[in-house]
């Protein structure tokens, strides 16, 4: 059974939750052993996969969990706005560290390495390639280039203003076009995640609402301050 077939089976059985275990940079939680513990807890709670950033975090997590890991490396580049797995060396390092799926930025922006080359490198390692996209055009272009999975990860993050709500219409449009879609980005409640499935998502990635304690506390603090004013 292929990994996609196994994921199809697991998603059908448990609902398709993927947990992104990426603490706020510099947080007390931003340590490989804590990231790995989060991932293990997510697996034990029914997550079908986890999304992990960074080689040290990935290695530690791989030693603890059995679910597939979506691996990424984030970089801040002077010459490009692309942050997610921009280099071929990043793909190689993620493959060696134990990722089963490698995600790359799939947007049509200036970049050091073409999306096509990154996807080909992932497949060279016999791994699944995921493209983090911002639009229907991005998603369809990456699908044509061979991406196995299209994520809505970048929707709302390539423009000056980021909406509060997730991009459900993008999920539907990509699904209707025949893409295997992971809904990602601002799915901050179970209701929104469930709505993504109704719109055609294959699975839903949730990050901040589960693993970023500072964000969750901020939401509660803001609500309490408004109630008290």
Curated annotation (Swiss-Prot):
Pathway: Amino-sugar metabolism; N-acetylneuraminate degradation; D-fructose 6-phosphate from N-acetylneuraminate: step 3/5. GO terms for cellular component: cytosol. GO terms for biological process: carbohydrate metabolic process; N-acetylmannosamine catabolic process; N-acetylneuraminate catabolic process. Pfam families: NanE (PF04131). CDD domains: NanE. The keyword Isomerase applies. Its EC number is 5.1.3.9. GO terms for molecular function: N-acylglucosamine-6-phosphate 2-epimerase activity. It catalyses: an N-acyl-D-glucosamine 6-phosphate = an N-acyl-D-mannosamine 6-phosphate. Keywords: Carbohydrate metabolism, Isomerase. It is an enzyme of class 5 (isomerase). Belongs to the NanE family. Converts N-acetylmannosamine-6-phosphate (ManNAc-6-P) to N-acetylglucosamine-6-phosphate (GlcNAc-6-P). This is Putative N-acetylmannosamine-6-phosphate 2-epimerase 2. It comes from Salmonella typhimurium (strain LT2 / SGSC1412 / ATCC 700720).
């Amino acid at each position: 059974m292929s990994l996609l077939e196994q994921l199809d089976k697991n998603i059908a059985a448990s609902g398709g939750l993927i947990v992104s275990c990426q603490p706020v940079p510099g947080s007390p939680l931003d340590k490989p052993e804590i990231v790995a513990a989060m991932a293990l807890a997510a697996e034990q709670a029914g997550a079908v996969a986890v999304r992990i950033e960074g080689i040290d975090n990935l290695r530690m997590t791989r030693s603890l969990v059995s679910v597939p890991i979506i691996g990424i490396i984030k970089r801040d580049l002077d010459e490009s706005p692309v942050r997610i797995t921009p280099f071929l060396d990043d793909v190689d390092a993620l493959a060696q560290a134990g990722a089963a799926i490698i995600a790359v930025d799939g947007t049509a922006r200036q970049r050091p390495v073409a999306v096509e080359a990154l996807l080909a490198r992932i497949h060279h390692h016999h791994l699944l390639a995921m493209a983090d996209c911002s639009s229907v055009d991005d998603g369809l272009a990456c699908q044509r280039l061979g991406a196995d999975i299209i994520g809505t990860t970048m929707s709302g993050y390539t423009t000056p203003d980021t909406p509060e709500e997730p991009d459900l219409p993008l999920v539907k449009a990509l699904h209707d076009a025949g893409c295997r879609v992971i809904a990602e980005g601002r799915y901050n409640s179970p209701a929104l995640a469930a709505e993504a499935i109704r719109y055609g998502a294959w699975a839903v990635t949730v990050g901040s609402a589960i693993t970023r304690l500072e964000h969750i506390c901020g939401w509660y603090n803001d609500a309490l301050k408004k109630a008290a004013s």
